Protein backbone atom coordinates (compact mmCIF):
# COMPACT_ATOMS: atom_id res chain seq x y z
CA UNK A 1 0.00 0.00 0.00
CA UNK A 2 1.13 3.52 -0.75
CA UNK A 3 1.19 6.33 1.80
CA UNK A 4 -1.66 8.83 1.63
CA UNK A 5 -1.17 11.46 -1.11
CA UNK A 6 0.89 8.97 -3.16
CA UNK A 7 -0.26 7.18 -6.32
CA UNK A 8 0.19 3.51 -7.10
CA UNK A 9 1.33 2.24 -10.50
CA UNK A 10 2.73 -1.18 -11.45
CA UNK A 11 3.25 -2.12 -7.78
CA UNK A 12 5.22 1.08 -7.08
CA UNK A 13 4.28 4.31 -5.31
CA UNK A 14 4.77 7.75 -6.85
CA UNK A 15 4.29 11.33 -5.77
CA UNK A 16 4.96 14.64 -7.50
CA UNK A 17 6.49 17.40 -5.40
CA UNK A 18 6.41 21.01 -6.56
CA UNK A 19 9.67 22.12 -4.92
CA UNK A 20 12.45 22.81 -7.42
CA UNK A 21 15.87 21.42 -6.51
CA UNK A 22 18.89 19.79 -8.11
CA UNK A 23 19.05 16.01 -8.60
CA UNK A 24 21.19 15.33 -5.51
CA UNK A 25 18.94 17.35 -3.19
CA UNK A 26 15.82 15.88 -4.79
CA UNK A 27 17.06 12.31 -4.26
CA UNK A 28 17.89 13.09 -0.62
CA UNK A 29 14.46 14.69 -0.14
CA UNK A 30 12.74 11.72 -1.76
CA UNK A 31 14.51 9.14 0.40
CA UNK A 32 13.42 11.08 3.50
CA UNK A 33 9.74 11.01 2.50
CA UNK A 34 9.19 7.25 2.69
CA UNK A 35 11.33 4.21 3.49
CA UNK A 36 12.73 2.75 0.28
CA UNK A 37 11.80 5.79 -1.80
CA UNK A 38 14.04 7.01 -4.63
CA UNK A 39 13.85 9.71 -7.25
CA UNK A 40 12.36 8.46 -10.50
Swiss-Prot record:
Q: Which residues form the C-type lectin domain?
A: 9-40
Identify the GO cellular component terms for this protein: extracellular region
Recorded hits in InterPro entries, A to Z, give: C-type_lectin-like/link_sf, CTDL_fold
The record, for SUPFAM superfamilies, names: C-type lectin-like
Coiled coil feature spans: none
Sorted alphabetically, which keywords does the UniProt record give?
A: Disulfide bond, Hemostasis impairing toxin, Platelet aggregation inhibiting toxin, Secreted, Toxin
Quote the tissue specificity entry: Expressed by the venom gland.
- Keyword Disulfide bond attributed: yes
State the compartments where it is located. Answer: Secreted
**Cysteine pairings via disulfide bonds:** 2-13
Give one GO term, molecular function aspect: toxin activity
Source domain of life: Eukaryota
Q: Which family does it belong to?
A: Belongs to the snaclec family.
| General function of this protein | Platelet antagonist that specifically and reversibly binds to a site on platelet glycoprotein Ibalpha (GP1BA) close to or identical with the site for vWF binding. It inhibits the binding of vWF to platelets and vWF-dependent shear-induced platelet aggregation.
Fill in the subunit field for this protein. Heterodimer of subunits alpha and beta; disulfide-linked.
* Protein name according to UniProt: Snaclec tokaracetin subunit beta
Amino acid sequence: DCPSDWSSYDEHCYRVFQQKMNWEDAEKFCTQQHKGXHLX
